[in-house]
Amino acid sequence: MLSTRFVTLAILACLLVVLGLARGAGGDPGVKQRIDVAREEERRDFWHAACSGHGFPITTPSTAAILFYVSLLAVGVAVACQAYRAVLRIVTLEMLQHLH
């Protein structure tokens, strides 16, 4: 019967062989260099002035202010509804305790 130590060493040796073969089959080093250069160019050209024209423009102060106040109103309504629900549950609980 094989010992667990021998099996562990065999599995480790197989993994090392597979990793060595995978590293050796890396391919042309020029391809990796070209990919790195392309990624560097993409990092430099990430933002462009023409890109800001897409979507919903919020660069004007009036649009940004309207969006801010609508969002603030929505958050305020949500907080008020949750507070009303909490108070209603507390009052209901107190009333049920006084009935019994």
From Swiss-Prot:
Pfam family, one: Herpes_UL49_5
Membrane topology value: Single-pass type I membrane protein
Keywords: Disulfide bond, Host Golgi apparatus, Host membrane, Membrane, Signal, Transmembrane, Transmembrane helix, Viral envelope protein, Virion
Chief location bin: virion
Subcellular location: Virion membrane; Host membrane; Host Golgi apparatus, Host trans-Golgi network
Intravirion face residues: 85-100
InterPro entries per UniProt: GN_domain, HSV_GN
Superkingdom of the organism of origin: Viruses
Signal sequence extent: 1-27
Regions that span the bilayer: 64-84
Segments on the Virion surface face: 28-63
GO cellular component: host cell Golgi apparatus; host cell membrane; membrane; viral envelope; virion membrane
Annotated function: Envelope glycoprotein necessary for proper maturation of gM and modulation of its membrane fusion activity. Also plays a critical role in virion morphogenesis.
Quaternary structure note: Interacts (via N-terminus) with gM (via N-terminus). The gM-gN heterodimer forms the gCII complex.
Family under the similarity heading: Belongs to the herpesviridae glycoprotein N family.
Protein name, as recorded: Envelope glycoprotein N
Source organism of the structure: Equine herpesvirus 1 (strain Ab4p)
Gene that produces this protein: gN
